[in-house]
């Protein structure tokens, strides 16, 4: 999609694939000291979710990596294999707002005693075994959705990267410039 935009805008549009936290170096490297606007798209693409080698979604399955850049950071499988139940529960609560965080974390730790929780299917099953969701709330999503979100945010240090990127974007904006953040 991005490639289709370039002919329309020519040299007024510069696209770079990088982490938000790299904006302070990427923009000057592309010749920008000041900009009129910046766009941050915080969403996952359906291609990332469907890629079974990445482990972003439980529907696609595959190994639990969850890194946006497979050459950086610690994959989700390592966090699941090494963090204590209390640390996992805190992670699920902080980044996923998961009300069953402690039960799911215990299910992960119990399961890894016999075999590693190494695939999206394994983690989805732990999410389901963490106990039923609140019966008074309608169930619109898979029980492991918030756990997957929490792990992805932790693996990619998304909140820290976003904070650094937003600060850099504000420094780059000309007076009257616009910063647009897409989040859904």
Locate the predicted segments by residue.
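S-adenosyl-L-methionine-dependent methyltransferase catalytic core, i.e., the SAM/SAH-binding region
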Residues: 1-184
């Amino acid at each position: 999609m991005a490639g289709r935009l370039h002919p329309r805008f020519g040299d007024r549009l510069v696209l770079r694939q990088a982490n938000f936290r790299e904006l302070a170096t990427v923009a000057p490297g592309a010749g920008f000291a000041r900009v009129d606007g910046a766009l941050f798209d915080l969403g996952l693409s359906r291609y990332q979710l469907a890629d079974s080698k990445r482990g972003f979604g439980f529907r696609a399955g595959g190994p639990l990596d969850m890194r946006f850049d497979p050459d950086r950071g610690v994959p989700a499988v390592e966090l699941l294999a090494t963090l204590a139940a209390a640390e996992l529960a805190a992670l699920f609560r902080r980044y996923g707002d998961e009300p069953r965080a402690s039960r799911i974390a215990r299910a992960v730790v119990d399961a890894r005693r016999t075999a590693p929780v190494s695939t999206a299917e394994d983690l989805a099953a732990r999410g389901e075994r963490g106990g039923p969701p609140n019966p008074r709330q309608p169930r619109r999503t898979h029980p492991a959705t918030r756990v997957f979100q929490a792990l992805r945010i932790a693996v990619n240090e998304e909140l820290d990267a976003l904070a650094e990127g937003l600060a850099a974007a504000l420094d780059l904006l000309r007076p009257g410039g616009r910063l647009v953040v897409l989040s859904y």
